[in-house]
UniProtKB/Swiss-Prot annotation:
SMART domains: HTH_XRE (SM00530)
Protein name in UniProt: Uncharacterized HTH-type transcriptional regulator RC1195
Annotated SUPFAM superfamilies: lambda repressor-like DNA-binding domains
Entry keyword DNA-binding: yes
Highest taxon listed in the record's lineage: Bacteria
Organism of derivation: Rickettsia conorii (strain ATCC VR-613 / Malish 7)
UniProt cross-references to CDD domains, sorted A to Z: HTH_XRE
Keywords, alphabetical: DNA-binding, Transcription, Transcription regulation
MF annotations from Gene Ontology: DNA binding
Length: 109
């Protein structure tokens, strides 16, 4: 269940400001978590593969500035990598997007 469904002040009249504020906070938490997870994945893989940011940018066709912003995820709270960027990273390292964002996939067996 999504966090936004657990507490949704938007359902009640007169809570417009609270709704906007909570939506902003919720998106900040989600975005920060995503950016940090991609950063952690890249730190690990760049070290394992013994490659640098510039090389990764060249071979994936991701702008170097984007790679740098990902690597500064904690310092730059407003940045969130785009899906296309995450996909390019996953393709290069031959893994899934779920692995890049460290998302645990539930098995529905």
């Amino acid at each position: 269940m999504k966090l936004s469904r657990l507490f949704d002040p938007c359902n009640k009249a007169g809570n417009t400001r609270l709704c906007i504020y909570l939506s902003f906070i919720y998106s900040e938490v989600i975005n920060m978590a995503l950016a940090t997870k991609v950063k952690e994945f890249l730190e690990e893989k760049l070290k394992q593969e013994k490659i640098d940011r510039k090389y990764l940018a060249e071979v994936t066709n991701i702008p170097y500035t984007t790679v740098s912003r990902i690597m500064r995820a904690e310092a730059n709270r407003e940045f969130n990598p785009e899906i296309d960027t995450i996909l390019k990273i996953a393709k290069y390292f031959n893994c899934t997007m779920d692995e890049v964002i460290k998302r645990k996939v539930q098995n529905n067996s």
